[in-house]
Amino acid sequence: NEAVTKTRAEIESIVKSIDSRMTIHDFRMTPSGEKRTNLIFDAVVPAGLAFTKAELEGLICEKAVRLNPTYNCVITFDDDFTVEE
């Protein structure tokens, strides 16, 4: 679906603007009535990031709503335990 692909790319851009090491996966869009669209996804948070998960959620959701006021983010945060070399 073109709309899902476009919106996923926009959300990926938002996440990368916060920290280039962050990634998202399992992205879905589900309409919730006429005035709301849930953006449901997982975000991988790198170790040592200066933001709490609540702060990250606020930043991501605020920027998503600027793209489209009907967007409502539902984010599951995963910790990234991989070791950078």
Where are these regions (language model features)?
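Alpha-helical transmembrane segments and adjacent TM-loop junctions that form the membrane-embedded core
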Residues: 1-85
